[in-house]
Amino acid sequence: MVHFTAEEKSTILSLWGKVNVEEAGGEALGRLLVVYPWTQRFFDSFGNLSSASAIMGNPKVKAHGKKVLTSFGEAVKNLDNLKPAFAKLSELHCDKLHVDPENFKLLGNVMVIILATHFGKEFTPDVQAAWQKLVSGVATALAHKYH
């Protein structure tokens, strides 16, 4: 279980309140699909994923990215209970979608990069550390059903 200090919680909540979920979510999922092309196999129904520009402009990628980042809102609301908060998503990704749990870590790392690009100097090393801890905790919670 991940333990967040009061300062880390405050840092996460403060930044989360400024995140444009639609924009950042689409960009994060899009980058995941571009940088790690083998992850595209889980998105066969999304249509054209033939190039970086096709992926980044794909409305299905943007919509699902928003959905993914919205689920991170659940993490922000449940910092002390990540595993229960992601139990159903863990089951879905394990039993029905058969997603390699390593992909959760990759997406988390991409999300940290997106946040850094969106927030620039505001994304200090302390902010990065708190968010890295969060995305790692979410990846672990999502992988829970696999164990």
From Swiss-Prot:
Alphabetically ordered keywords of this record: Heme, Iron, Metal-binding, Oxygen transport, Phosphoprotein, Transport
Function noted in UniProt: The epsilon chain is a beta-type chain of early mammalian embryonic hemoglobin.
Tissue specificity annotation: Red blood cells.
Organism: Microcebus murinus (Gray mouse lemur)
Name of the molecule in the record: Hemoglobin subunit epsilon
Source taxon at top rank: Eukaryota
Subunit structure: Heterotetramer of two alpha chains and two epsilon chains in early embryonic hemoglobin Gower-2; two zeta chains and two epsilon chains in early embryonic hemoglobin Gower-1.
Residues at which heme b binds: H64, H93
Family stated for the protein in its record: Belongs to the globin family.
All residue ranges annotated as the Globin domain in the record: 3-147
Sites of Phosphoserine modification: S14, S51
Biological process per Gene Ontology, one example term: hydrogen peroxide catabolic process
GO annotation, cellular component aspect: blood microparticle; haptoglobin-hemoglobin complex; hemoglobin complex
